[in-house]
Design a protein with these regions (language model features):
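N-terminal beta-strand motif that seeds the catalytic metal site of vicinal oxygen chelate
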Residues: 1-18, 60-63, 121-144
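Short, structured motif recognition centered on aromatic/hydrophobic residues
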Residues: 7-10, 24, 29, 40, ...
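Vicinal oxygen chelate
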Residues: 15-18, 35-36, 64-144
Length: 144
């Protein structure tokens, strides 16, 4: 049986969506808020790696995994008889929403269209505990 190929995103509830967006922007993510959902992406082709919606209490909502294929998604969804739906987020594809044994939401998606890669300028300065040399710049590290 095929299965999961990667962790795709995490989803949270936050008490202040704009403050969270600023934090992520300063951290170097590319962000946007669309219909009350904060979406953040890195420099790779994934249309989002972090999702957040506003709520009265901060909370972990779910983790999203990328299935190896639509067939793998269907196999995984069949384990619990979970319906497969059209993914309403950027990149489209299909999604199955499951619940793990501890009650946490797990989303498994397939066939999400990649976004274009984001270019990263030369080496950026590093932030430390005293001085912030890099605000709002994305940083990518080359693999060794």
């Amino acid at each position: 049986m095929t299965g999961i190929k990667d962790v795709l995103y995490v989803r949270f509830c936050v008490t202040d969506l704009q403050a969270q967006q600023k934090f992520l922007d300063d951290f170097g993510f590319q962000t946007r808020i669309d219909d009350g959902l904060l979406m953040a992406r890195g420099t790779d082709g994934s249309p989002y790696i972090y999702l957040a919606e506003e709520a009265s209490e901060p909370a972990f909502v779910s983790v999203g995994f990328a299935a190896e294929s639509e067939a793998a998604l269907r196999d995984i969804a069949a384990i619990d008889g979970t319906p497969i739906e059209t993914n309403p987020l950027s990149g489209g594809g299909l999604i199955a929403r499951l619940t793990d044994p501890n009650g946490f939401s797990v989303e498994v998606v397939a066939d999400i269209a990649d976004s274009s890669l984001l270019t990263v300028a030369g080496r950026s300065g590093f932030n430390d505990g005293v001085e912030k040399q890099r605000l709002g710049e994305r940083v990518a590290f080359a693999a060794p």
